[in-house]
Amino acid sequence: MYWQKIPKTSEKNYISGYEALNIPNENGDIADWHPRTYLSSQNPNEYIKTYKLDETIGNVGIKNKTINFPYKAEVYIANFVRAIIDIIIFSERDIEIKSLYGCRNDFLTDKEEKELFEELIEILKKGHKKSDKIVMFLENEYPRK
């Protein structure tokens, strides 16, 4: 097994999703606990997956910072809230969203959990093309709000 290589990133092509959830944030915390699943490969030349910027959402939650895992590098990477939002809006199948159920309690601090809800509501107000996926997630994660 090899750790995947760090790709070239930019504000419009950045690390996000489960990959970002498995890279320690500035506090050294990780949200998900499966780095081998999302950051390793049998192929020594494989790169970490990147995401293309969704223009409706913009660059909220994407920062240029130095990461120390799997290698030290300066990259554009989503914070945990944005990583979850990207999983929702880039999902091709409902199972990908269902795999996030419980994430606000498992992955996020109270502050991040509130930020996730507020960001998703803002995206809905903009009429995002994946609004149905966002509603599906919100109905499960925030049933009383």
What is each model feature region?
Residues 1-66:
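Short gly/ser-rich loop at a beta-strand->alpha-helix junction or flexible surface loop bordering the NTP-binding
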Residues 63-145:
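Hydrophobic alpha-helical interaction segments
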